[in-house]
UniProtKB/Swiss-Prot annotation:
Prolines at the third position of the tripeptide repeating unit (G-X-Y) are hydroxylated in some or all of the chains. Type X collagen is a product of hypertrophic chondrocytes and has been localized to presumptive mineralization zones of hyaline cartilage. This is Collagen alpha-1(X) chain. Homotrimer. The lineage of its organism: Eukaryota, Metazoa, Chordata, Craniata, Vertebrata. Residues 410-419 have a biased composition (Gly residues). It comes from the Eukaryota. It is found in: Secreted, Extracellular space, Extracellular matrix. Its main location: secreted. GO terms for cellular component: cell cortex; collagen trimer; collagen type X trimer; collagen-containing extracellular matrix; extracellular matrix; extracellular region; receptor complex. Ca(2+) 1 binds at D626, E627, L633, D634. It comes from Mus musculus. PANTHER family: COLLAGEN ALPHA-1(X) CHAIN (PTHR15427:SF48), EMILIN ELASTIN MICROFIBRIL INTERFACE-LOCATED PROTEIN ELASTIN MICROFIBRIL INTERFACER (PTHR15427). Keywords: Calcium, Collagen, Extracellular matrix, Hydroxylation, Metal-binding, Repeat, Secreted, Signal.
Length: 680
């Protein structure tokens, strides 16, 4: 059965091929060839010419099919046919397995997707304790915490006697008691602990001391008084004559009315006279004004440990390195006042201190009567300029001489060294107690500071030996100046001889207006009530600009870092202060010309935060705060326009001791400026 299958297939193909051949290659025209396609070709039948008569025979009977020819070569593959119509046939049986292929290493495939997280494993065993880590850097100070609830007060056991507390505030001076008997000289007590108290109020001026003996006679020739001539005929106004010697003081007349405030330039300070005879040793003076607090230290605060038992006192150790500044602790309660000790012996005279802060300007005194004009003396020949001598000790003040002729402006002299401070005078009598002042306005609340933990008290060391007297401290903050009562006028002293002419001193403060002069002066010279001129320009123009508007301006620099807290900051290096309205010793600007002013300040911050305020007459006008970043140098500035009247005062001040990191040095300047914008 199987060998007949290929034979039947060949027979089927032969029949199909024969039917296709008969239909394709037999045409009705009798022309051999393929039929024309009705779409692409058009066949036109035509008759073939021949020499004979065309005879067309009848179609014969088709002969029997010939034998099957040999199978031809497979033709070229035709174009793909159109998709047929019909349902797909049944799936054939799987073929025989093919021969094994050649194995070769394939390329690595793409990474698969991440697997699902596995289940949580069991807890491992506890590991050993690791080594202690290094201490981390100090973090920034945290915000102040919420105050905790009030604790339950339980009376505790009485503790041991505490250390002597800080001295309390200075009380009011009591009434002068009767003089007691001198006590036995006691031993000198140890140096106490505590911050210096605030300077007390200024006492009333003491009684005027006795007049000292006149100084030695100065070297020089005094002209003889000429005889008064007879009055001649009044002629033309002549040149001013030499100023004659001052006559003897006349009897004191009745006090006149207070004159108007004069306009003038302060005269030059007179030359120091010959040293006088040293007087007797005076009484010990009152303690000086406390100096400003020192620069804040820097220290790292440790954790408070448990209080141990008190051990034996050890030897005093060597001074350690300066640590970082710790947080300020709370002030302790004032201790009980101790019993007064016996009066010790009088100590040796201390080193003269620096000049104190100038007091308030006193009232203008009464104008005395003018003395009679003296006779004109002969003018001596001018002497040669001598070498500059060393500054002598201050002598006794002689009588005020008559003003001389205006001299030419000399070259600026070399600034002399400040003289030693003279001995303090005797204590004056007790003044009349003043009235209690009205309560001032309540200040604005300050920035809350961070509260640090209180450390345990240290073991007290052995008392050290008495140290050498220290250098005089810097002047402290300005005290509250109270106006004292005018003391009685002392008797006039005998006139001393005229001393040598010294070098011109620094210009002094303006004095009270003098009485109107009676001397007749020619044109071109100073008259009573006339403004002095210098080089054709009024001296009052130093306070006026080019346009005639009044001028008041200053710019100053702070030379030392970390100024005192609670007092005006003394900017002591002057860039411009021609009108002298700013005082570099106190750091206060005093308004002399009422109007609108502009103030500005620029400060640097280092070590801790800074909180600086602009004050007007003791009241803060505005604040500037800068939070310090460790390792950096910050800046802060502020400015304001203010309306000032005469004698108003403006300054900069640090109101808080915990925010006092105001820094200034030789190359990093903190400055303060102000100027008049428009007068009123």
């Amino acid at each position: 059965m199987l060998p007949q299958i290929p034979f039947l297939l060949l027979m089927f193909l032969t029949l199909v091929h024969g039917m296709f051949y008969a239909e394709r290659y037999q045409t009705p025209t009798g022309i051999k060839g393929p039929l024309a396609s009705p779409k692409t070709q058009y066949f036109i039948p035509y008759a073939i010419k021949s020499k004979g008569i065309p005879v067309r025979g009848e179609q014969g009977i088709p002969g029997p099919p010939g034998p099957t020819g040999p199978r031809g070569h497979p033709g070229p593959s035709g174009p793909p046919g159109k998709p047929g119509y019909g349902s797909p046939g049944l799936q054939g049986e799987p073929g025989l397995p093919g021969p094994p292929g050649i194995s070769a290493t394939g390329k690595p495939g793409l990474p698969g997707p991440p697997g699902k997280p596995g289940e949580r494993g069991p807890y491992g065993h506890k590991g050993d304790i690791g080594p202690a880590g290094l201490p981390g850097p100090r973090g920034p100070p945290g915000p102040p915490g919420i105050p905790g609830p009030a604790g339950i007060s339980v009376p505790g056991k009485p503790g041991q006697q505490g250390l002597t507390g800080a001295p309390g505030p200075r009380g009011f001076p009591g009434e002068k008691g009767a003089q007691g008997a001198p006590g036995v000289n006691g031993r000198k007590g140890e140096t106490g602990y505590g911050s210096p108290g605030r300077p007390g109020e200024r006492g009333l001026p003491g009684p005027q001391g006795p007049i000292g003996p006149p100084g030695p006679s100065g070297v020089g020739r005094r002209g003889e008084n000429g005889f008064p001539g007879q009055p001649g005929i009044k002629g033309d106004r002549g040149f001013p004559g030499e100023m004659g010697p001052s006559g003897p003081p006349g009897p004191q007349g009745p006090p006149g009315k207070q004159g108007r405030e004069g306009i003038g330039k302060p005269g030059a300070i007179g030359s120091p006279g010959q040293p006088g005879i040293p007087g007797e040793k005076g009484h010990p003076g009152a303690p000086g004004i406390a100096g400003p607090p020192g620069a804040p230290g820097f220290g790292k605060q440790g954790l408070p440990g448990l209080r141990g038992q008190r051990g034996p006192a050890g030897l005093p150790g060597a001074p350690g390195a300066k640590g970082e500044r710790g947080p300020a602790g709370h002030p302790g309660e004032p201790g009980l006042p101790g019993s007064p000790g016996n009066m010790g012996p009088q100590g040796p005279k201390g080193i003269p201190g620096n000049h104190g802060i100038p007091g308030a300007k006193g009232e203008i005194g009464l104008v005395g009567p003018a003395g009679p004009p003296g006779a004109r003396g002969a003018r001596g020949p001018p002497g040669l300029d001598g070498k500059t001598g060393y500054p002598g000790e201050p002598g006794l003040n002689g009588p005020k001489g008559n003003p001389g002729l205006p001299g030419q402006k000399g070259d600026p002299g070399v600034g002399g060294t400040p003289g030693l401070r003279g001995p303090v005078g005797p204590v004056g009598a007790k003044g009349v107690p003043g009235h209690n002042g009205e309560a001032g306005p309540r200040g604005e609340p300050g920035i809350p500071g961070t509260r640090g933990p209180t450390g345990p008290p240290g073991v007290p060391g052995f008392p050290g030996s008495k140290g050498d007297p220290g250098n005089p401290g810097a002047p402290g903050p300005a005290g509250i100046a109270t106006k004292g009562l005018n003391g009685p006028t002392g008797p006039p002293g005998p006139p001393g001889p005229r001393g040598h002419s010294g070098e011109p001193g620094l210009p002094g403060p303006p004095g009270p207006p003098g009485p109107p002069g009676q001397a007749v002066m020619p044109d071109g010279f100073i008259k009573a009530g006339q403004r002095p001129r210098l080089s054709g320009m009024p001296l009052v123009s130093a306070n006026h600009g080019v346009t005639g508007m009044p001028v008041s301006a200053f710019t100053v620099i702070l030379s030392k870092a970390y100024p005192a807290v609670g007092a005006p900051i003394p900017f002591d290096e002057i860039l411009y202060n021609r009108q002298q309205h700013y005082d570099p010793r106190s750091g206060i600007f005093t308004c002399k010309i009422p109007g609108i002013y502009y103030f500005s300040y620029h400060v640097h911050v280092k070590g801790t935060h800074v909180w600086v305020g602009l004050y007007k007459n003791g009241t803060p006008t505005m604040y500037t705060y800068d939070e310090y970043s460790k390792g950096y140098l910050d800046q802060a500035s502020g400015s304001a326009i203010m309306e000032l009247t005469e004698n108003d005062q403006v300054w900069l001040q640090l109101p808080n001791a915990e925010s006092n990191g105001l820094y200034s040095s030789e190359y990093v300047h903190s400055s303060f400026s102000g100027f008049l914008v428009a007068p009123m």
